[in-house]
């Protein structure tokens, strides 16, 4: 039980500790990229003349995570392109209203409901350019629940007629599908109306999206209220036991609903020595293997590094 003085300090202590923890754990966009501001797609992405082949009939859309941009895919995008995929990426969720979001090259800080609508528009652009009714999506961290928001609320999936879905396969990498406890600190948040001021402080420093990914946030309650999945969509959910951002790591896993298939996988079950942290997981050879195997079950490339 907190003493009265401690309870009075909670509105100051809790956001300060959460901000420090989340800031320390999350990995920003690569400072050594040729275009760290996210304005230029990674090699292999956004060839708008690309037409999908019979071997890979769906274009692949890459969706980065919080504080990242499309350069998060500078390893995976050229790998997928080399395998014959049409690959597309974007930088979404730019919002300079927060201290973190005002920094150059930092995206994925805006309200996730607005960012989901950005994803919806981009997917429609890709479908129109490639002449395909559906896309496959690979999403990291925030990108996972963001795409699920797009599918559920912004036209990405049709529960009444799954044949009209715009997404065939969603592959997530360390996604905050059910939120994060920020290594347990999220449980310190008060409930009800007392939570709003604290989340407001977090949003001003780290961005609205950071607050929305804390466990039991209003955004996640709304997203997950109707179940984790959409009929007709295939899901591959990739998790690392060493993840210190999505905590506990298994909260990323999804439960298949009617008409959906879900494959929840641990990186370390395939490659026990894989120690890539949360922000670097899109560069992990193990993750790359899981992604390519999910998109094409016939893929037989190397899995583990070394």
Predicted ranges, named:
Residues 64, 87, 105, 115-223:
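Serine-dependent carboxylesterase/thioesterase catalytic core
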Residues 61, 88, 171, 236-238, ...:
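Hydrophobic/aromatic beta-strand patches that form the interior of the parallel beta-sheet core
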Residues 33-39, 46, 53-134, 192:
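Active-site catalytic motif of lipid deacylating hydrolases and related acyltransferases
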Residues 99-102, 179-186, 247-251, 276:
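Short aromatic-enriched loop/helix-cap "lid" or pocket-rim segments at secondary-structure transitions
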């Amino acid at each position: 039980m907190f003493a009265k003085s401690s309870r009075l300090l909670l509105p100051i202590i809790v956001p300060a500790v959460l901000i420090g923890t989340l800031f320390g754990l999350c990995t920003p966009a690569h400072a050594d990229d040729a275009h760290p501001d996210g304005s230029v797609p990674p090699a292999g992405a956004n060839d708008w003349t690309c037409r999908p082949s019979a071997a890979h009939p769906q274009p692949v859309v890459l969706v980065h995570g919080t504080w990242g941009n499309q350069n998060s895919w500078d390893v995976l995008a050229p790998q997928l392109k080399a395998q014959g995929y049409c690959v597309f990426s974007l930088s979404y969720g730019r919002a300079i209203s927060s201290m973190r979001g005002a920094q150059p090259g930092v995206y994925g800080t805006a309200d996730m409901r607005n960012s989901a609508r950005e994803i919806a528009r981009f997917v429609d652009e890709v479908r129109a350019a490639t002449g395909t009714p559906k896309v496959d999506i690979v999403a990291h961290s925030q990108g996972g629940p963001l795409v699920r928001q797009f599918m559920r609320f912004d036209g990405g999936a049709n529960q009444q007629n799954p044949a009209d879905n715009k997404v065939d396969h969603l592959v997530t990498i360390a996604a905050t599908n059910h939120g994060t406890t920020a290594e347990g600190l999220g449980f310190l948040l008060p409930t009800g109306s007392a939570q709003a001021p604290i989340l407001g402080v977090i949003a001003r420093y780290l961005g609205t999206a950071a607050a929305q990914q804390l466990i039991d946030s209003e955004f996640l309650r709304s997203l997950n209220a109707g179940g984790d999945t959409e009929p007709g969509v295939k899901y591959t959910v990739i998790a690392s036991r060493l993840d210190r951002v999505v905590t506990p790591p298994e909260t990323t896993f999804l439960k298949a609903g009617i008409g959906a298939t879900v494959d929840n996988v641990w990186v370390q079950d395939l490659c026990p020595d894989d120690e890539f942290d949360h922000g670097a997981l899109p560069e992990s050879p193990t993750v790359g293997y899981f992604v390519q195997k999910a998109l094409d079950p016939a893929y037989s490339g190397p899995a583990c590094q070394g």
